[in-house]
């Protein structure tokens, strides 16, 4: 039997996904309240969290191969 002693790294993709969703919702609510500065800040947070999500997914795909 061959064992792989390489430690397994668990990548959390769900948290940045949920954070991006929340930031988009908060951005939408800020627009409805006519707080465009907050809306823009939350939109940027959604972009940043989406990039973290993408990186996590890319890492998971590389580990799969």
Mark where each language-model region is.
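Short intrinsically disordered terminal tails
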Residues: 1-5, 61-65
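Short, charge/polar-rich alpha-helical segments
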Residues: 2-14
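Short, charge-rich amphipathic interface segments used for partner binding and complex assembly
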Residues: 22-64
């Amino acid at each position: 039997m061959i064992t792989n002693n390489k430690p397994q790294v668990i990548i959390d993709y769900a948290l940045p996904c949920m954070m991006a969703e929340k930031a988009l919702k908060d951005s939408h609510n800020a627009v409805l309240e006519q707080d465009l500065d907050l809306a823009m800040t939350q939109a940027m947070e959604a972009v940043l969290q989406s990039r973290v999500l993408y990186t996590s997914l890319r890492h998971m795909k590389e580990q799969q191969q």
